[in-house]
Design a protein with these regions (language model features):
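ABC ATP-binding cassette signature C-motif
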Residues: 3-278
């Protein structure tokens, strides 16, 4: 996709809410090209609503929320439960072909391989997939759709670790603009260059990455340390479990991973995946 306008999103004097609950009160924001913005806060604080307002999917009560130049801003929106909207009668490979008809077929097949779909899945109807497989296919479909502005609402839900890492690498290599909602702090650490914290009708703008946000927010920093400690305990358990595997089991696991994700450097794959958007 071509470059977007310099101003990708603008919010002026925005006040918005539902019934008696006010989500935003006189909010002003500007998001520029190439920023990767994390939108964080408790459930129900208005993050998804803000995404819809900026895209024009919902009208504000007062004030303005809009994209920059709509002719130049090519938007791709990954919303929650997107996997549920996949056409169950269409095959796995055909789902990507319909999303990106100009993309070489071998490139689409390679992407499916990196998303752990071997050739036996290519003609399988989407309705036969598990919930996790549908989530991975929805992400693959998202990745092949050309865009220069990406809106992602909880994109890592139901993704396995390799798929999540591939998404992180692709987003870091992406030259366009990213707005991401996620409760996955480790994901946000990898991708964010700016943080918008939603809290009780206010949005605090941290013009730095997620580590910068933590350094300015004691409560969030303490919570992040607890989550990091829990993650280490889980990783230790996985290491112990893996050490108990037989040599044959380890060899089989290694072979399956190699088959699913192919060969080549991670950076090269990330650039190729990001290139589908750029």
């Amino acid at each position: 996709a071509p470059r977007s306008s310099q101003i990708v999103a603008q919010v002026r004097g925005l006040t918005h809410g539902y019934d008696e609950k006010t989500l935003f009160q006189n909010v002003n924001l500007q998001i520029d090209r190439s920023e990767r913005v994390a939108m964080i806060g408790d459930n129900g604080c208005g993050k998804s609503t803000m995404m819809r307002l900026i895209q024009g999917r919902e009208k504000p009560n007062n004030g303005e929320a809009r994209l920059g130049d709509k002719e130049l801003c090519k938007v791709n929106y990954f919303y929650q439960n997107q996997a549920e909207d996949l056409d169950g009668d269409v095959g796995v490979l055909e789902t990507l072909v319909r999303a990106a008809p100009d993309e070489p077929l071998n490139q689409l097949k390679a992407l499916l391989g990196r998303m752990a779909f071997n050739t036996s899945y290519h003609d399988r109807p989407v309705s036969y997939l598990s919930g996790g497989e549908k989530a991975r296919l929805a992400l693959a479909k998202f990745m092949v759709t050309p865009a220069n502005v990406l809106f992602l609402d909880e994109p890592t839900n139901h993704l396995d670790i390799p798929s999540k890492q591939m998404l992180e690498e692709a987003l870091r290599s992406f030259e366009g603009t990213v707005l991401a909602i996620s409760h996955d702090r480790f994901f946000l650490r990898q991708i964010a260059t700016r943080v918008l914290a939603f809290d009780e009708g206010k949005i605090t703008d941290y013009e730095g990455d997620y580590a910068y946000y933590l350094s300015k927010n004691d409560k969030a920093g303490a919570r992040d340390e607890i989550l990091a400690a829990k993650k280490k305990e889980i990783e230790k358990t996985q290491i112990v479990s893996k050490s108990k595997m037989s040599k044959a089991e380890k060899a089989k696991l290694k072979k399956e991973k190699a088959k699913a994700f192919g060969s080549g450097s991670g950076k090269a794959k990330a650039k190729k995946n990001a290139g589908r958007w750029n």
